[in-house]
Amino acid sequence: MGVSGSKGQKLFVSVLQRLLSERGLHVKESSAIEFYQFLIKVSPWFPEEGGLNLQDWKRVGREMKRYAAEHGTDSIPKQAYPIWLQLREILTEQSDLVLLSAEAKSVTEEELEEGLTGLLSTSSQEKTYGTRGTAYAEIDTEVDKLSEHIYDEPYEEKEKADKNEEKDHVRKIKKVVQRKENSEGKRKEKDSKAFLATDWNDDDLSPEDWDDLEEQAAHYHDDDELILPVKRKVVKKKPQALRRKPLPPVGFAGAMAEAREKGDLTFTFPVVFMGESDEDDTPVWEPLPLKTLKELQSAVRTMGPSAPYTLQVVDMVASQWLTPSDWHQTARATLSPGDYVLWRTEYEEKSKEMVQKAAGKRKGKVSLDMLLGTGQFLSPSSQIKLSKDVLKDVTTNAVLAWRAIPPPGVKKTVLAGLKQGNEESYETFISRLEEAVYRMMPRGEGSDILIKQLAWENANSLCQDLIRPIRKTGTIQDYIRACLDASPAVVQGMAYAAAMRGQKYSTFVKQTYGGGKGGQGAEGPVCFSCGKTGHIRKDCKDEKGSKRAPPGLCPRCKKGYHWKSECKSKFDKDGNPLPPLETNAENSKNLVKGQSPSPAQKGDGVKGSGLNPEAPPFTIHDLPRGTPGSAGLDLSSQKDLILSLEDGVSLVPTLVKGTLPEGTTGLIIGRSSNYKKGLEVLPGVIDSDFQGEIKVMVKAAKNAVIIHKGERIAQLLLLPYLKLPNPVIKEERGSEGFGSTSHVHWVQEISDSRPMLHIYLNGRRFLGLLDTGADKTCIAGRDWPANWPIHQTESSLQGLGMACGVARSSQPLRWQHEDKSGIIHPFVIPTLPFTLWGRDIMKDIKVRLMTDSPDDSQDL
């Protein structure tokens, strides 16, 4: 506005009260000052650069909206938005101040406001104006003041200025005074007529008039602050009726105008209270802006009734006082017929519940007719008289009913029909399930129990098999972690295998994951000869299936077509002597019992794979099974590998060659335990006529991992399922799962940061540094729990420095990291900045110092 400081504040407050009082609205001075201070905080440019025009005022509104989004709506004064909206309507209707700015573009805003304020404040205090006396003197004085600021030339040049320009300024100010005097009312009617009787359109003033103006200007002094005169407060006086421009009798606005003239208040909203309490408040009707209705209808049509933006518009509408009839009219005008019926039903239910809850309270009674707008409150005119508390309840029920409208295209079905898709991730299914449950009932213990039950019952068959071991003891978070292995790649591979076998997806999953004992699925037992279901091998009538396929080239001697178990050669095709054939493991069908040897028990060869390390390459018949009921044959790595995230997909050799059994196809899938440890196996298909080496595609899923030579990393499924007399590693599987695959280790790369590791001590989690130079584990004093007993030791710890006053745990502590655990007696050092994990723990965790060359690796 061109004026800052206390003078600018008083000017703004005066103008604000004056403009609003002309519309019949009263604003306290304290509220106006609070709004001005908030305006400076939101738009600091406004006092110096802004003006009361529609463009700048809309910019202020946008900045108020951003301020509310950043600091919350509670940080905005309660009168800020109503004042801004009223001024926007005034500026839209081309208020007097806007017209003044448009007419006097050559005069700066600061000069015109100061001149206008001084003129109005002085003229309002005068009792009589005279036809050519006081008014002309005041105008001439203001012209002289403005001329002193407008012209920067010396006094002599001012005398030579064009008189026509001065006359233009006089004519502009006269027009402003004329409009201001017209708004003073009956109190100055007589003086206004005399003042307006002057011929303002006369371009040339007579010499007598100019003499009168100069004489009055000599006695004119305005030493007071620039405060526009405002109407005095009238205690308990009903505000004047709102002065509105006549609406054109066309369209929706014309229909509303005609209805108001005839006394029809069907669409009378919102209700505006003019005071601060229910006793003094006199409800006044104001129409809801048509732009708001159009915005709400557009949001419902384009984004749906339950979209976040639509709900924001509904909240904006709910910020006003709307009666039940208003809400019904708004919902009927913006919602589709079906959604309106849903909204009305929910609104009635919410209202009945609220009346029942309020029945036992001693406060003002709230009847169902008040909330629904029925009975004696059926007419809109009677609903206007409802108290604020009742209107708040009406708005609350209306908004809750609106939020209960489902999104477009979503049918309200029972929760039992909300099932997980075959290719849908489990966490996405849980998200949909929680959204549906929370729409029906509030969050609480009951909803959590229902979600957990449906999370098991409505999951797909693969996730149900993964959740089954922890169904009763686990939580929803445990279910999600268990189903992380059910990645889309695994599901896609399983679906492809089921399609090749000609089975349903659910049936194939049950057979693959042990849905029936001995390979018996939902369709009955599976024949190990022909691969079909419904009968066993001894009852198989397929003659082709009863005959054993002819053997290929012997993998032992490479010079005959016979089975390896029947090979009697002592030399291979190159004349090299062959080791004696292990008849107890090859010729007999007895299983190899016991666990696979640990890395410490075996040096070279294939560790823990069940394969003979002295006779590579291997065939399909040499691959072992984990247990007799295992569906897949184990594929093992034949070299040491270190995988990082940067390596991408790598090929792991298995040294398995040869064709698959006739009529079968191989599917390579990963093991669930490996994925938990950070190793991801990509599925692959092996054709029946493939004769090369089978390799496994792997990559690091989370961080760097180590694969030792001989570790089982994948499984080979023969489709259709064929039970071959392969060796078995373990007689019974028992309850083992997700951790039976060994030797895929935790790895941390050495970087600029310290190698830190989380370890549990007596169930408490500690973060410490891997210190290969520490013989014993040392716990920092700040990490040690106060209730754990310790005792002082007479010895001191010495390394690069020396630590005195060392304590030690009075009781042994059990440590645990992943599937490894042990007992330690750690030291407690008060001055230690962080915990140090010593070699007493690292050797049991199997921490290894490795490089890209496995020969340079060293175990701790």
UniProtKB/Swiss-Prot annotation:
Zinc finger (CCHC-type) residue numbers: 525-542, 552-569
Domain of life: Viruses
Biased composition (Basic and acidic residues): 151-169, 178-191
BP GO terms, sorted: proteolysis; viral translational frameshifting
GO molecular function: aspartic-type endopeptidase activity; DNA binding; dUTP diphosphatase activity; structural constituent of virion; zinc ion binding
Enzymatic class: hydrolase
Catalytic activity entry: dUTP + H2O = dUMP + diphosphate + H(+)
Pfam families cross-referenced by the UniProt entry: dUTPase (PF00692), Gag_p10 (PF02337), Gag_p24 (PF00607), Gag_p24_C (PF19317), RVP (PF00077), zf-CCHC (PF00098), zf-CCHC_5 (PF14787)
pH relationship of activity: Optimum pH is 4-6 for protease.
Site positions for Cleavage: 99-100, 195-196, 228-229, 254-255, 269-270, 496-497, 745-746
Region described as Disordered: 151-191, 572-631
Domain spans labelled Peptidase A2: 766-841
Compositional bias annotation for Polar residues: 584-599
EC number(s) recorded for this UniProt protein: 3.6.1.23, 3.4.23.-
Catalytic residue positions: 771
Lipid addition sites, N-myristoyl glycine: 2
Keywords: Aspartyl protease, Capsid protein, DNA-binding, Hydrolase, Lipoprotein, Magnesium, Metal-binding, Myristate, Protease, Viral matrix protein, Viral nucleoprotein, Virion, Zinc, Zinc-finger
Any one cellular-component term (Gene Ontology): viral nucleocapsid
Functional description taken from the UniProt entry: Nucleocapsid protein p14: Binds strongly to viral nucleic acids and promote their aggregation. Also destabilizes the nucleic acids duplexes via highly structured zinc-binding motifs.
Name this protein carries in UniProt: Gag-Pro polyprotein
